[in-house]
Amino acid sequence: MGMKQKIMIVDDAEINRQILMAILGDKYEYVQAENGCQAVHMLQHDLTIDLILLDINMPEMNGFQMLERMNKFHWIDEIPVIMISSEEKRDIIERAYILGAEDYIRRPFDAFIVRRRVQNILNLY
């Protein structure tokens, strides 16, 4: 069997990171960050990430600011991002797509939808 695909989960709430890893199972390798600043620092040293699951509302650097940074360094062209948030406002969701997110998953999580969307995005890249 080949190497596991690597998913970075960026969320300031550890419980949300744990839930996502539990939903997705041991099929993937995981890297965790508590905010966009930490995630960007990690990406500067390791671009072998296959997918980023990115929360919007976080301290230090939020999800939108991280997407802007990823655009600046052209990482957004290489690493797909799925935004995760409980936010339902259309303008927030649209902003995620405009900044380069491939998809948007709302909390509370539906396990089937999370697994399917993650697999669909990974199959495209």
Language model regions located:
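C-terminal output helix
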Residues: D91, F109-V118, L122
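Two-component/phosphorelay signaling modules centered on CheY-like receiver
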Residues: A13-V31, Q44-H45
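Receiver (REC) domain active-site loop signature in two-component systems and cognate sites
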Residues: M58, M70
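Acidic, metal-coordinating helix/loop segments flanking the phosphotransfer/catalytic sites
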Residues: Q32-L51
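A Lys-centered signature of the CheY-like receiver
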Residues: P59, R107
